[in-house]
């Protein structure tokens, strides 16, 4: 019985590890296409997606921000002469490719 339980537990851990969503993190990516702060990879938890926030001023990309985000949803809004574009996705490293 214990061997079967251990086998099933290891199989479950392997499946979870293989199917976990991986996202790029970058807390400050500049127009020169370079991450200045927080570059890495996060593993999305339950209910999280990969998120990319792009901030434009006069239709020119100023900075972007990438992270694992809970309650992520696609949206665009304008505030103080800037346009904020939130984009969410659900496959590995997708927030870097958008």
Swiss-Prot record:
Cellular localization per UniProt: Secreted
Disulfide linkage: 23-50, 26-35, 42-68, 72-88
Tissue: Specifically expressed in prostate and testis.
Keywords carried by this UniProt record: Disulfide bond, Secreted, Signal
Cleavable signal peptide: 1-20
InterPro entries for the chain: LY6_UPA_recep-like (IPR016054)
Protein name: Prostate and testis expressed protein 3
Organism: Homo sapiens
Encoding gene (name): PATE3
């Amino acid at each position: 019985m214990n061997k079967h339980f251990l086998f099933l537990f290891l199989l479950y851990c392997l499946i979870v590890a293989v199917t976990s969503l991986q996202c790029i993190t970058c807390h400050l990516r500049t127009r020169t296409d370079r991450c200045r702060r927080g570059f890495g990879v996060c593993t999305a938890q339950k209910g999280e997606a990969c998120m990319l926030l792009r901030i434009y001023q006069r239709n020119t990309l100023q900075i972007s921000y990438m992270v694992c985000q809970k309650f992520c949803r696609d949206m665009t809004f304008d505030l103080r002469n800037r346009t904020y574009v939130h984009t969410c996705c659900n496959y590995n490293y997708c927030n870097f490719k958008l």
